[in-house]
A protein has these predicted regions:
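Core segments of transmembrane alpha-helices
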Residues: 44-51, 111-119
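Membrane-helix interface segments
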Residues: 60-64
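Individual transmembrane alpha-helices with interfacial aromatic-anchor signatures
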Residues: 96-117
């Protein structure tokens, strides 16, 4: 079995679950997101990483690594800025005390860890020679 694909699968599935829960919490903290918008955003955020998983499992490591890296890096930059750097209603350090504060902080940190891990896995996948090319040379 492909170890890179296994690790990527864990990260992408965990990321999908945490993104959904995080967006539900965002909707509770800052009203404005409907249930349909949360579901649509979750689907959109996780579509490209899911395609990347299929590519990684079918031994297209470079393309799969690129498609895994791109959305996770964008999420890392935007989420890291929104939740840890820029002051605002969704910054974990400046949020008002609500019953959702601790779960929101936990999901923000989990997303940070999963996105960094996913980017690292994607870079490792991108640096490897795809299995199909290695078999063709033999």
């Amino acid at each position: 079995m492909n170890r890179t694909a296994r690790y990527a699968t864990f990260v992408v599935l965990a990321h999908a679950a945490v993104v959904f829960w995080h967006l539900v919490l965002v909707a509770k903290i800052t009203p404005g997101l409907t249930e349909h918008q949360v579901l649509a955003a979750t689907t959109a955020i996780n579509l490209v990483p899911t395609v990347a998983l299929v590519l990684l499992w079918t031994h297209f490591l470079r393309l799969g690594g690129f498609l895994l890296f791109l959305p996770l890096a964008v999420g890392l930059i935007i989420g890291g800025s929104e939740h840890f750097v820029t002051p605002g209603p969704l910054n974990v350090f400046y949020m008002a005390t609500t019953p959702w504060l601790l779960p929101f902080r936990v999901t923000a940190v989990l997303l940070l860890v999963l996105e960094v891990s996913g980017c690292w896995i994607a870079i490792q996948a991108f640096r490897r020679v795809p299995f199909l090319q290695a078999e063709a040379k033999q």
